[in-house]
């Protein structure tokens, strides 16, 4: 551990204690040695006693910087772990940091390009268009065609800083795991590992560029979503170049109203986009907070979304997709038994789970939701409450489903912000029912066969040879097994013969000894002893030598 990491660790502890976060820890996490350590830091006092626990955590993370801000944002989506009060406070964290020097950005860009910026771009603006904790965005125009572009570049030394904070978080999580013991609901190490994978993925701008290209290709003919063009030839792990867009931030409701945007159509398209990404393409944008979404300025009566920042993308297995769709349909049909079955069949909870107890727990949580109209029921909260319930039955956390839940909550919140009367169920139900219909029945079977047909037709000419080879191999195996059986039987015969001779020799030797002790003048003891010794020698020498067969 370096001096810098010790200094950083002390700063983190000091900040957490100054916000009195030790006061909100459960008794399990404050054994006598924790209290002793806390009392030894007597000069660090709680300066925010009047604030709630959630607000104090938010302020502490804001003070600790970008890595902790992003962790807080991620935790705000884990409502299966945190109370709504704490989650709502963390959701207010903003990833806003002062920009770094434009000259440093120029150096970083030129290091990736291995050439001066002016070799490829004109009008490079050293004043950033936007700045965040991991990267910064600058504007320019392409020298080759004069088109406006943005250059996204990582902050200097950001990787080392993030790795150092992640190591500290991981070590702290292990301590908390130890203090909470087996069976704790929070599972800090699991949370930090999910966060580590997410944030390290954001450090590779080449990967983000490839994600954006794939998402753009999925919606090339769409009138609902536009992904800016990515100039792949200028994309590297620390640099990404893409088309500049001029949309209206989705959070700027006043500007959207001023241009006469069709909010109902926009909200419905948002829901359709989510389900299309998940169920049609199996590739969904998992970071759809308002800062990454813009609305087109042209054709406000037929608006479309503009999506940015494809650093975090999610995918589901075919099994997960099917179980998820069935879950939603079962919920709105109030089939709680089927929901419980689906969680067990999918492997999300253990097959040893008490099905009746699990079904009853789901019913207790979900039934009150039907006291409100269908158009007021939140898909995201349905999924959230199901996960919370399953948590008590030791659910195996699926990171891809956590991403999905977060995205669904974003989309729902956004849709109802744009159009409060949005009936999410009526918008999504036809899509889910159509998708389920495509997964079962003759049509689905024909589609699956059609998908496999090229592979089968490629392998068909090899079938006769494969059948012949397998028959030949079968004969060899049969012959080999017969040989092994013969050897085994021969071994058993030899073993039985040897054992018989050894036992007989032992009996003769014992009898000879007893007779000799009674009357040494008789000839019978000598016959017994000599015969016994001879049989023992024959039996010993006739033992099978090789046990391999």
Curated annotation (Swiss-Prot):
It is a multi-pass membrane protein. It is found in: Cell inner membrane. It comes from Shewanella sp. (strain MR-7). Its EC number is 2.7.-.-. One of its GO terms (biological process) is ubiquinone biosynthetic process. This is Probable protein kinase UbiB. Keywords: ATP-binding, Cell inner membrane, Cell membrane, Kinase, Membrane, Nucleotide-binding, Transferase, Transmembrane, Transmembrane helix, Ubiquinone biosynthesis. NCBIfam families: PRK04750.1, UbiB. Its main location: membrane. Is probably a protein kinase regulator of UbiI activity which is involved in aerobic coenzyme Q (ubiquinone) biosynthesis. Belongs to the ABC1 family. UbiB subfamily. It is an enzyme of class 2 (transferase). GO terms for molecular function: ATP binding; protein kinase activity. The chain crosses the membrane at residues 498-518, 520-540. Pathway: Cofactor biosynthesis; ubiquinone biosynthesis [regulation]. One of its GO terms (cellular component) is plasma membrane. ATP binds at residues 129-137, 152. The active site is at 287 (proton acceptor). The lineage of its organism: Bacteria, Pseudomonadati, Pseudomonadota, Gammaproteobacteria, Alteromonadales. Residues 123-501 form the Protein kinase domain. It holds the Pfam family ABC1.
């Amino acid at each position: 551990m370096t001096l810098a990491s010790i200094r950083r660790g002390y700063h983190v502890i000091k900040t957490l204690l100054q916000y009195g976060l030790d006061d909100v820890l459960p008794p399990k996490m404050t054994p006598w040695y924790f209290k002793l350590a806390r009392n030894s830091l007597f000069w660090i006092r709680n300066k925010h006693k009047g604030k709630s626990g959630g607000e104090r955590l938010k302020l502490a993370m804001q003070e600790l910087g970008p890595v902790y801000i992003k962790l807080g944002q991620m935790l705000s989506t884990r409502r299966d772990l945190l109370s709504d009060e704490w989650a709502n406070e963390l959701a207010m964290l903003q990833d806003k940091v002062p920009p770094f020097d434009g000259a440093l950005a120029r150096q970083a860009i030129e290091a990736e390009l291995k050439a001066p910026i002016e070799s490829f771009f004109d009008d490079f603006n050293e004043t950033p268009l936007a700045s965040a904790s991991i990267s910064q965005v600058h504007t320019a125009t392409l020298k080759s065609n004069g088109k406006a572009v943005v250059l996204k570049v990582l902050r200097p030394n950001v990787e080392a800083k993030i790795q150092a904070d992640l190591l500290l978080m991981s070590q702290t999580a292990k301590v908390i795991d130890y203090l909470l013991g087996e069976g704790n609901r929070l599972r800090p190490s699991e949370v930090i590992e999910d966060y580590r994978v997410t944030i390290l993925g954001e450090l590779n701008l080449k990967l983000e560029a490839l994600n954006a290209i794939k998402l753009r290709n999925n919606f090339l003919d769409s009138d609902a979503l536009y992904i800016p063009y990515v100039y792949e030839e200028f994309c590297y792990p620390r640099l990404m170049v893409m088309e500049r867009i001029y949309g209206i931030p989705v959070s700027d409701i006043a500007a959207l109203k001023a241009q006469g945007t069709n909010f109902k159509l926009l909200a419905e398209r948002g829901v359709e986009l989510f389900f299309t990404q998940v169920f049609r393409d199996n590739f969904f944008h998992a970071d759809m907070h308002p800062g990454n979404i813009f609305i087109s300025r042209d054709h406000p009566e037929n608006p479309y979304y503009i999506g940015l920042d494809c650093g975090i993308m999610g995918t589901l297995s075919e099994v997960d997709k099917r179980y998820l769709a069935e879950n939603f349909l079962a919920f709105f049909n109030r089939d709680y038994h089927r929901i419980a079955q689906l969680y067990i069949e999918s492997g999300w909870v253990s097959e040893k789970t008490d099905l009746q107890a699990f079904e009853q727990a789901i019913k207790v949580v979900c039934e009150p939701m039907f006291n409100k109209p269908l158009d007021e029921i939140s898909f995201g909260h349905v999924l959230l409450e199901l996960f919370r319930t399953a948590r008590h039955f030791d659910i195996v956390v699926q990171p891809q489903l956590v991403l999905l839940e977060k995205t669904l909550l974003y989309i729902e919140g956004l849709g109802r912000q744009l159009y409060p009367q949005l009936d999410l169920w009526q918008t999504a139900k036809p899509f889910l029912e159509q998708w389920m219909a495509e997964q079962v029945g003759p049509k689905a079977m024909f589609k699956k066969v059609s998908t496999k047909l090229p592979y089968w037709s490629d392998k068909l000419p090899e079938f006769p040879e494969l059948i012949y080879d397998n028959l030949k191999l079968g004969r060899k195996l049969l012959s080999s097994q017969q040989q092994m059986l013969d050897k085994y039987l021969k071994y058993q015969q030899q073993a039985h013969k040897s054992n018989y001779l050894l036992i007989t020799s032992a009996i003769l030797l014992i009898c000879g000894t007893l007779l000799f002790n009674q009357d040494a003048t008789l000839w019978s003891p000598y016959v017994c002893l000599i015969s016994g010794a001879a049989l023992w020698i024959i039996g010993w020498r006739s033992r099978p030598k090789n046990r391999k067969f």
